[in-house]
A protein has these predicted regions:
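Long, contiguous binding/interaction regions
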Residues: 1-152
């Protein structure tokens, strides 16, 4: 969508359609690229995250049963959330699992610095990063919806 208004209208259209079908919509959310105009960057003179917004990164990591405890330790020590379920099964012992880091306060440069620390820690411990998706949430009706999930 070309602008925030169009994205918001499409989100509302989908939400209303689901409600009309009898579904209980518990959350409405719009995620954008991290370079969205609303995203805070120090180089632009920003000093504060816009209200209700946050940066988030999803890391798909190749793991084995033997290394899962180590990955869990890394996740906790870097303030990340490690998914409870495998994202993709590769073989009987190897799988891809998702690790998520979210920041409600950091400017992008600080977020990126911590992300690089996470990736360096994974590489040092010989984990293979398969995919990285960085997002900027510009609208979220339940910003604390994932709070328990992220802290688990």
């Amino acid at each position: 969508y070309g602008n925030n208004g169009e994205a918001f209208n499409e989100m509302k259209r989908i939400s209303n359609a689901l409600t009309n079908l009898g579904y209980n919509v518990v959350r409405e959310k719009i995620e954008a690229s991290y370079w969205h105009t609303k995203a805070p960057f120090k180089e632009d003179g920003d000093t504060k995250m816009p209200e209700g917004c946050y940066f988030e990164v999803h890391l798909n990591i190749e793991c084995t049963n033997e290394k899962l405890n180590k990955l869990n330790q890394i996740s906790k020590s870097t303030n990340c959330h490690l998914s409870k379920n495998a994202f993709k099964i590769i073989d009987d012992n190897t799988f891809t699992i998702m690790m998520t880091y979210r920041s409600y306060e950091q400017m992008f440069e600080d977020f990126e610095e911590h992300l690089n620390f996470i990736k360096d820690t994974l590489q040092f411990n010989q984990f293979k990063l398969e995919k990285e998706i960085i997002e900027f949430a510009i609208y979220d009706t339940k910003i604390n919806h994932d709070k328990l999930w992220l802290e688990a």
